[in-house]
């Protein structure tokens, strides 16, 4: 089953170097931490937000660049055992778009149902 969600906002916490993509009106159920990438899950078992800790190091960008995100997308593949997250992001750096990617893999420790989900944000 494939589900698409459109996140409507992002916040970058410069001091703590974390990005939070959100915007869903779903009710929160729980979170799962994929080694510093936190997925918030709604009552419908769909991903409703993503927080990326230590973001500048993970994306190999200056912290200032993370204030200029122009596009973000994430694909979340849930199996019985694992959750695989693939992210792509474009930032405006010196009037030029720079594309970055990041992958994460973790255990499906909260028994989410098997699914493929997508999240997208255009700024």
From Swiss-Prot:
It comes from the Archaea. Disruption phenotype: Cells have increased resistance to the purine analog 8-aza-2,6-diaminopurine (8-ADP). Its EC number is 2.-.-.-. Disulfide bonds: none annotated. GO terms for molecular function: transferase activity. GO terms for biological process: purine ribonucleoside salvage. The keyword Transmembrane does not apply. Keywords: Purine salvage, Transferase. May play a role in purine salvage. This is Putative hypoxanthine phosphoribosyltransferase. It comes from Methanosarcina mazei (strain ATCC BAA-159 / DSM 3647 / Goe1 / Go1 / JCM 11833 / OCM 88) (Methanosarcina frisia).
């Amino acid at each position: 089953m494939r589900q698409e969600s459109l996140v409507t906002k992002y916040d970058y916490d410069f001091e703590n170097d974390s990005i939070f993509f959100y915007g869903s009106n779903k009710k929160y159920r729980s979170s799962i931490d994929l080694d510093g990438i936190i997925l918030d899950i709604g009552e419908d078992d769909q991903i409703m937000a993503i927080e990326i800790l230590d973001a500048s190091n993970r994306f190999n960008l200056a912290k200032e660049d993370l204030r200029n995100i122009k596009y973000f997308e994430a694909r979340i593949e849930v199996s019985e055992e694992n959750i695989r997250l693939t992210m792509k992001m474009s930032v405006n750096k010196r009037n030029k778009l720079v594309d970055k990617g990041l992958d994460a893999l973790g255990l499906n420790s909260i028994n989410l149902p098997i699914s493929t989900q997508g999240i997208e944000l255009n700024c």
